[in-house]
């Protein structure tokens, strides 16, 4: 089979299984509403949980950061570590209660940590529902990967405590699972890993900013401080990028051995300025978190009497389970015809038979937006 044949066969299989992905060109930002062509939609597909991507202070901070120019021209190990980057790292570490924070490009944070830390003989205990960046890295690094059923403390205990391991063990999970909207039992997981002399790494992409005191996230909410915490900035922060929170020695180790960090151009300083402004708004953002919770409650209460199959989620992620790929696409199309932008999620992002509409609620949504969503969902589910 030639290269071209292999590529065309893979594309044909995606089309046959109604799993083919297509990008859509939007205009005018990605907030409460989204514009495609000449039509405006209510946006229920974005991760901008607190609406900070459109926040005037965050935008102004980015504009003021233009004094640095539009890019770094190098890695943070060369010329790319500015005063803006340093200030952001220090503020994040102080806020989340860690000695150090290191800035990364979003997807690369998980990849970098696992690639740098894991060696032959080590074992990664990877939650099956973890983000693709974690699972991909877990399968590619030197350590052996041991899949753990989602939220299975019993499964983790069996693998972590009972099976011998020549090297070190690292359990990786998410604070909130991005496709189901539920959370991992972090306190119990950390108790098990500590008892076994293992480390716990938590990617809290969907919890940072919206859970816990001052939005410090899922770990803070559960009274847990994992050895490695990944905070990403593309959700509640409304920007992009990520940070790894850890102890002093681990930070220095990553600076020496994390190739994704060493050999990548650092994020623009203006982005670091915007992230500082977003962090300040998150820390004082009880009003935004309360508004988000109000919208979640309004949706859950309104959906209860409807013929909808929802997961048991009390978060901004509200999956409507459909099962069949084509039916999920058809429902998404009908919602868009009614002015609602909702994405159909299909395998391989979710397991086979797990196609769904992933409804994402934000603090920017208004009460009438939630009511309109419920009205249309009721109509299309008949």
From Swiss-Prot:
Reply yes or no: does the keyword Transferase apply: yes
Q: Which Pfam families match?
A: Aminotran_1_2 (PF00155)
Q: Quickly give the catalysed reaction.
A: 6-carboxyhexanoyl-[ACP] + L-alanine + H(+) = (8S)-8-amino-7-oxononanoate + holo-[ACP] + CO2
> What Enzyme Commission number does this protein have?
2.3.1.47
- Please list the residues that carry the modification N6-(pyridoxal phosphate)lysine: 235
Q: Where does substrate bind?
A: 21, 131, 349
Is Transferase there in the keyword field? yes
Q: Name one GO molecular function term.
A: 8-amino-7-oxononanoate synthase activity
Residues recorded as binding pyridoxal 5'-phosphate, renumbered to this chain, are 178, 206, 232
Listed PROSITE patterns: AA_TRANSFER_CLASS_2 (PS00599)
InterPro entries hit by this protein: Aminotrans_II_pyridoxalP_BS, Aminotransferase_I/II_large, AON_synthase_class-II, AONS_Proteobacteria, PyrdxlP-dep_Trfase, PyrdxlP-dep_Trfase_major, PyrdxlP-dep_Trfase_small
Q: Which UniProt keywords apply?
A: Biotin biosynthesis, Pyridoxal phosphate, Transferase
In what pathway does it function? Answer: Cofactor biosynthesis; biotin biosynthesis
GO terms under biological process: biotin biosynthetic process
HAMAP family for the chain: BioF_aminotrans_2
Oligomer and partners: Homodimer.
Name of the protein: 8-amino-7-oxononanoate synthase
Q: Which organism is it from?
A: Serratia marcescens
């Amino acid at each position: 089979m030639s290269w071209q044949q292999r590529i065309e066969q893979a594309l044909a299989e995606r089309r046959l299984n109604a799993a083919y992905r297509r990008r859509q060109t939007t205009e005018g930002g990605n907030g409460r509403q989204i514009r495609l062509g000449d039509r405006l939609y209510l946006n229920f597909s974005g991760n901008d949980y607190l609406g900070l991507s459109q926040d005037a202070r965050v935008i102004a901070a980015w504009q003021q950061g233009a004094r640095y120019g539009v890019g770094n021209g190098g890695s943070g190990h060369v010329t790319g570590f500015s005063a803006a980057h340093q200030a952001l790292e220090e503020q994040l570490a102080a806020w989340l209660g860690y000695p150090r924070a290191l800035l990364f490009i979003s997807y690369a944070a998980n990849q970098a940590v696992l690639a740098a830390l894991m060696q032959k003989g080590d074992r990664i205990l990877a939650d099956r529902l973890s983000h693709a960046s974690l699972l991909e890295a877990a399968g590619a690094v030197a350590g052996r990967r041991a899949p753990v059923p989602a939220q299975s403390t019993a499964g983790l205990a069996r693998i972590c405590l009972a099976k011998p391991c020549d090297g070190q063990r690292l359990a990786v999970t998410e604070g909130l699972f991005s496709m189901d909207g539920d959370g991992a039992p972090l306190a119990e997981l950390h108790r098990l890993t500590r008892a076994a002399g293992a480390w716990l790494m938590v990617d809290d992409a969907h919890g940072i900013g919206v859970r816990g005191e001052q939005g410090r996230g899922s770990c803070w909410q559960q009274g847990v401080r994992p050895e490695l915490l990944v905070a990403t900035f593309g959700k509640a922060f409304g920007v992009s990028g990520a940070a790894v929170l850890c102890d002093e020695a681990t930070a220095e180790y990553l600076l020496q051995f994390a190739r994704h960090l060493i050999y990548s151009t650092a994020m623009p300083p203006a982005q670091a300025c915007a992230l500082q402004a977003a962090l300040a708004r998150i820390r004082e953002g009880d009003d935004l978190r309360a508004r988000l919770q109000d919208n979640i409650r309004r949706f859950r209460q309104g959906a209860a009497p409807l013929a909808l199959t929802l997961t048991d989620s009390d978060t901004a992620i509200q999956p409507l389970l459909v099962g069949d790929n084509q039916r999920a696409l058809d429902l998404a199309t009908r919602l868009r015809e009614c002015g609602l932008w909702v994405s159909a999620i299909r395998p391989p992002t979710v397991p086979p038979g797990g196609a769904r509409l992933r409804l994402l609620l934000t603090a920017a949504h208004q009460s009438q937006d939630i009511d309109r969503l419920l009205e249309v969902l009721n109509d299309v589910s008949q």
